[in-house]
Each structure stands twice: as C-alpha cells, then as structure tokens.
C-alpha cells in the first residue's frame, strides 16, 4: 500500500513539474511576429489599432506589481501595459519577450504648475498586451 501511495505521489509531482508554460495571458503564435520598431512604423503609417504580435528586449519592468514593462528602442522605450488582466515577473529586465495586443495613443497631461503649460498635453504611443511569451 505504501508503494502505491508513493508511486501516485511521485506521478503527481512529475506531472506538476512537467508543463512549465512560458506564456502569460492569451497564447501567442510567434511565427508572424514583428519587431517593436517595425510595429511602431506600421502603426504610425496606418494609424490603425490592429492586433499584432511584437517582440523585443525588455528595458524596464514595474518593480511594485509587474503591471507593465517597457521594450528597448534605439532612442527611447515603448511602454506595455495589460489593462489589469495579468502581471509579469519582476526579474525580466534584459530578456527577450513577445507580446500580443494593439498599439494606442495615450494623452498625458502636463503636470507642471506653470499656467503656460497647463493646456499642453503630450501624446505618446503605448502597447496594450493581452498576452506575453518569454523567449
């Protein structure tokens, strides 16, 4: 009887360790993925918000909850958020990652107290991911 219980325990343990998924959120098909730079280029050219799979290297990640990360670009970064659908590990900086979702324009109001700048706002492009996959 002890052998049977032990065998069942070992079997369950092996099965639990076997399927370590490398994605979070919506599953991603990576064969049609484009670089972050190419995705931004296409978004600026069409101004359409279509679902796309992008990939790149993570430059930064939220160290509080893992609620956003930023892709490296040559002269800046692209912020990726998840609309509270999931979070990512906090130790993914410098790792390559895929994301499925869409680009969008976000208006950031000026936080300066100067009355000249109060009416000014800055439009930035961000990416809203529905799933991510680690390379």
Segments and roles (model prediction):
Residues 17-135:
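OB-fold and OB-like single-stranded nucleic-acid-recognition modules
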Residues 1-15:
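Sec-dependent bacterial lipoprotein signal peptides
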């Amino acid at each position: 009887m002890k052998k049977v219980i032990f065998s069942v325990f070992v079997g369950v343990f092996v099965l639990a360790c076997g399927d370590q998924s490398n994605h979070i959120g919506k599953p991603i098909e990576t064969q049609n993925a484009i670089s972050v730079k190419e995705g931004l280029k296409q978004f600026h050219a069409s101004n359409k918000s279509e679902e796309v799979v992008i990939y790149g290297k993570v430059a930064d990640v939220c160290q509080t909850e893992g609620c956003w990360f930023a892709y490296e670009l040559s002269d800046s970064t692209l912020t990726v958020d998840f609309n509270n659908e999931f979070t990512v590990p906090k130790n993914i900086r410098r790792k390559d990652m895929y994301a499925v979702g869409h680009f969008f324009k976000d208006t950031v109001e000026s936080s300066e107290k100067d009355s000249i700048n109060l009416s000014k706002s800055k439009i930035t492009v961000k990416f809203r991911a529905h799933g991510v996959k680690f390379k």
